[in-house]
Amino acid sequence: MFNCFFPDEYLDSTYVINFDDLYAQGYRGLLFDIDNTLVPHGAPADERACALFAHLKELGFKCCFLSNNQYERVSSFNDAIGVQFIENAHKPSTKNYIRAMELLGTDRSNTVFIGDQLFTDIYGCLLYTSDAADDLT
């Protein structure tokens, strides 16, 4: 019953993920939460985040921020990064996970979601990737 709140993998930081391996495994889309996933809550994009996204683009990943924050927060964070974004995403609703993948031209078989909150990020992603998700599209 509570499996929908457990991520497929747990790591201490986004910055320890081996994105080169993910790309080699065939993943092409990355969806990211922002606050407490990439930077502390409310912080601007820092050098580490900018370097990460430069590397991801170099690898060939398509990226999108999926955030429950308002436009001003997400847009200002993205100014230094330059990827697609969806603000006010209403996670855990699956609607904008689907929309983000449509923006990237990817699907659930080749997209990874990276977030920190169990009841919004993880739950929403697992709702979408469950077998029942086919009924939602």
Where is each model-derived feature located?
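Short active-site oxyanion
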Residues: 60-64, 85, 109-111
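Conserved Lys-Pro-Asp/Glu-containing loop-to-beta segment of HAD-superfamily phosphomonoesterases
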Residues: 94-119
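Short, acidic/turn-prone active-site loops that include or flank metal/cofactor-
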Residues: 88-94
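Short, structured coil segments at secondary-structure junctions
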Residues: 80-82
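Substrate-recognition element of Asp-dependent hydrolases with the DxDx(T/V) motif
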Residues: 30-32, 37-45, 49-78
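Non-catalytic pre-domain segments flanking phosphatase-related domains
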Residues: 1-32
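Acidic, divalent-metal-coordinating active-site segment for phosphoryl/phosphodiester hydrolysis
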Residues: 117-127
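Single conserved hydrophobic/aromatic residue that forms the stacking wall/gate
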Residues: 128-137
